[in-house]
């Protein structure tokens, strides 16, 4: 049982934010095993052109994972293929997760800007 526990990646997400911020992220918390597939959703209501996914690992600086501008990927800082973004429109940016590793346990944050 101890091995199974070690093989799980725990993803913590930013808590519920007031709607007046204009950016929401769901789900609030996510715990998944290495074989599960899940998605994180970022939605902005500010009319911004750019959206971002960040990763904050314990005792490490904030890491920029993906940048999308006008629904096109602008930057991908050598993120492993087990993280797959999807930007169906300028208001939504998904982060699809699969086959996660223990080192993927982190706080994942989304943001938007002009």
Swiss-Prot record:
Pfam families from the UniProt entry: V-set (PF07686)
Glycosylated residues, chain numbering: 76, 89
InterPro entries, per the entry: Ig-like_dom (IPR007110), Ig-like_dom_sf (IPR036179), Ig-like_fold (IPR013783), Ig_V-set (IPR013106), TCR_beta_variable (IPR050413)
Compartment(s): Cell membrane
Domain Ig-like: 22-114
GO biological process: adaptive immune response; cell surface receptor signaling pathway
GO CC terms, sorted: plasma membrane; T cell receptor complex
Extent of the signal sequence: 1-21
Description of how the protein assembles with itself and partners: Alpha-beta TR is a heterodimer composed of an alpha and beta chain; disulfide-linked. The alpha-beta TR is associated with the transmembrane signaling CD3 coreceptor proteins to form the TR-CD3 (TcR or TCR). The assembly of alpha-beta TR heterodimers with CD3 occurs in the endoplasmic reticulum where a single alpha-beta TR heterodimer associates with one CD3D-CD3E heterodimer, one CD3G-CD3E heterodimer and one CD247 homodimer forming a stable octameric structure. CD3D-CD3E and CD3G-CD3E heterodimers preferentially associate with TR alpha and TR beta chains, respectively.
Protein's job: V region of the variable domain of T cell receptor (TR) beta chain that participates in the antigen recognition. Alpha-beta T cell receptors are antigen specific receptors which are essential to the immune response and are present on the cell surface of T lymphocytes. Recognize peptide-major histocompatibility (MH) (pMH) complexes that are displayed by antigen presenting cells (APC), a prerequisite for efficient T cell adaptive immunity against pathogens.
Full protein name: T cell receptor beta variable 4-3
Species name: Homo sapiens
Gene name tied to this protein: TRBV4-3
């Amino acid at each position: 049982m101890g091995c199974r526990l070690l093989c799980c990646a725990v993803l913590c997400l930013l808590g519920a934010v007031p709607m007046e911020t204009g950016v929401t992220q769901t789900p609030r918390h996510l715990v998944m095993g290495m074989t599960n597939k899940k998605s994180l959703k970022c939605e902005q209501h500010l009319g911004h052109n750019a959206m971002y996914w960040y990763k904050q690992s314990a005792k490490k600086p904030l890491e920029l994972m993906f940048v999308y501008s006008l629904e096109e990927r602008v930057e991908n800082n050598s993120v492993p293929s087990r993280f797959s973004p999807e930007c169906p429109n300028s208001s939504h940016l998904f982060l699809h997760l699969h086959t996660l590793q223990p080192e993927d346990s982190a706080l994942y944050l989304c943001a938007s800007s002009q």
